[in-house]
Amino acid sequence: MPGLNFNDRVALITGASTGIGASTAVRMGECGVKVALNYFESQTEAKKVAESVEASGGVSLLIRADVRNAGQVSEMVVRTVKAFGKIDILVNNAGGMVKRVPVVEMDDATWDEVMNLNLRSVFYCSRAVVPHMIGRKYGRIINVSSVAAFMGGGRNAAVYAASKAGINGLTKGLAKELAPHGITVNSVAPGVIDTPFHARAETGSYDQFLPSIPMNRVGTADEVASLIAYLASDDSSYITGSVLHVNGGQYLG
C-alpha cells in the first residue's frame, strides 16, 4: 500500500495463517514491515502466508503458539524480540466462534473456551508486548472485534458477541492507560467477511446476509487488512480508543 509510513517497523500478528490475519500479514509485508506470524493449528497455511510476505518484499518469522496460554505468549514475544530487536505493532486477530450454543444449554467450559480464545488472548498478548513498547515510547495495538459486539451476533452466538464486546472495552481502557507512553490502541469490527472463519461459522450461503447489508455484498479480508494497516502505520498517530467498522453499512452506529 504505497503512501503509508511504517519507518522500519516490526509487527506481531496473531492468528495469521488464514483470513484477515493472513491478508494483514501480506499487506504489512508490502509496506516493508518485518512480520512475526503467529499460528496454532495450520503450519502448512502459515508457511504459505510467510512465503507471500517474503514475495511481497517483507521479512517473516513463523511462531507456533497457543495465545490462550500465557507462557506460550510470553515465549512468542521473546522470540520475536530476539529475531527483530523490538515489537512496534501488535495485531490481536486470533479468535473464533468455537460453536453455537443456546445460553440455557451452555456449560461453563464452553463459556470459558470462547472467552479464553477471543478475550483472554488479547489480554495475554497485550500484557506481554506492552513493556517493549513502553520502553521505546511507541506502539500500535489493533484488536479485531466484530459487528456481533454491537448487534448481538447471529443465532446462538451470545457468548461470542460478549467476548467481542469485551475486546472493545479492553481497547478503550488500554488506550487511556497507554496514551502517555506513545502507544495507540484501537479495534476493528468487521461485518460479514469472506473468510474461512465465516465459512465454518455460518450455515447456508452468504446471500442470507445481503438484505441487511446496504452495499449488497460481503467484505473481503483485504478490505479489513487495509484498515488494520492504516491503524498500524505512523499516519494514524492521533487515533486511539476507537472502534472502526468494516461492514458495508450493516451496522450504522
Per-region residue spans from a language model:
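Conserved glycine-rich cofactor-binding loop
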Residues: 10, 17-18
